[in-house]
Structure formats: structure tokens, C-alpha cells
Amino acid sequence: MSNVHLISHPLVQHKLTLMRRKNASTSTFRTLLAELSNLMAYEVTRDMPLQDIEVETPLETTTGKIIDGKKLVLVSILRAGNGFLDGFLNVVPGARVGHIGLYRDPETLSPVEYYFKMPQEMQERDIVIVDPMLATGNSAIAAVDRLKQLKPRSIKFVCLLTCPEGVAALQKAHPDVDIYTAAIDRQLNEHGYILPGLGDAGDRIFGTK
């Protein structure tokens, strides 16, 4: 699992544990997700390319390094993926944002696309897909399949939780996609939910059932 990055920072693990609690309110869950995604963004963007730039300090001119945030595209898998956006945009405010709508057929667990909106000129951009859960892997695979048609330079997948089944599925379909997660949980249940997990992330973010 060389392309799986488990983010084990104490603050990440602390906030994830608080999110797992079934009695965490919607506002608490949402706030923790924003804080956690902010922390995860540092790890996910660790290898972003830099370019040299001349900077005039109060004392002299020097060469500094900056990132080109406009080369980064955050792609939210609706609707739960939107909970990641604020945290990442706090770190890279120049990033572009795209959305892909996928819902899971309750019978087959297969993804069905209902929305797709991306920035222009996706070629040579670096894409970071955000979705709280990598469960069966079906939605992640469908999203990567669709985005690869746009010929980006790279694609990463970021989630709060995953499980061995989800990791194996995404790695088999797209071995070139790095996976970033705060936890690899035990297994899926018969309904395609991660155990022990934290429930339905979308419902917990938006207060729906």
C-alpha cells in the first residue's frame, strides 16, 4: 500500500475520534470536519511544485518560493465532499473547485452520475478529490474514471475514513492515484457502510436522515 498515506498526526486522530461519537451535534461535526480537513491539507499539498520569485524585503531583494495555487483543482464528490472544501481553501485559497455528483444505487451500490462541473483547461492541473468516505470504492473509481478523461497531471483522493475493501478497489482500478486518509477502519457491512466508521457523513454534515 505504498500509495496509501495514513495521516496519524495527534490532532487529526483527536478530532476524528470526536467526530465518531454518535451524540456529536451537526454543528460540532461540521466544525470538526473543517478543522480536520485544514490539517490534512498540509499533508496532501506537501509535494506541490514551487517556483522561484524575487521578493523585496525591508532590507534587500531575495529569491523566495511560491506555489501556483491556480494549478490545483479541488473536486468535491457531492454532497458530503463539500465539507472538506473550506479547510483546503484556507490553506490554498487560489485553488479552483469542481463538483461531481454521484449517488449510490441502494440495490447495486453502483454510482450514478447526476452532475459534473469543472474549471476550464483541466489539462496539466493537479486534482485532489475530496469525499469523507472511501467505502466500496465505486464512487471514487467512477470519479477518477471521469476526471482522467480531462487529462490532468495528477489525481489524489482524500478521505476521512476508508477500509481494506475500498483501498483495494481503488488501487486495482487506478494504481497511480495516491490515497490520503485519517484512518483505515476494519471492514464494510452488508449495506456498504464502514465499520466502526462514523455513520453517514453527508447526513451528519447537513443534519438530514
Curated annotation (Swiss-Prot):
Pathway: Pyrimidine metabolism; UMP biosynthesis via salvage pathway; UMP from uracil: step 1/1. One of its GO terms (biological process) is uracil salvage. InterPro entries: PRibTrfase_dom, PRTase-like, Upp_B, UPRTase/APRTase, Ura_phspho_trans. Its EC number is 2.4.2.9. Uracil binds at I194, G199, D200, A201. It comes from the Bacteria. It catalyses: UMP + diphosphate = 5-phospho-alpha-D-ribose 1-diphosphate + uracil. 5-phospho-alpha-D-ribose 1-diphosphate binds at R79, R104, D131, P132, M133, L134, A135, T136, G137, N138, S139, D200. Allosterically activated by GTP. It holds the Pfam family UPRTase. NCBIfam families: PRK00129.1, upp. Belongs to the UPRTase family. This is Uracil phosphoribosyltransferase. It comes from Polaromonas naphthalenivorans (strain CJ2). The gene is upp.
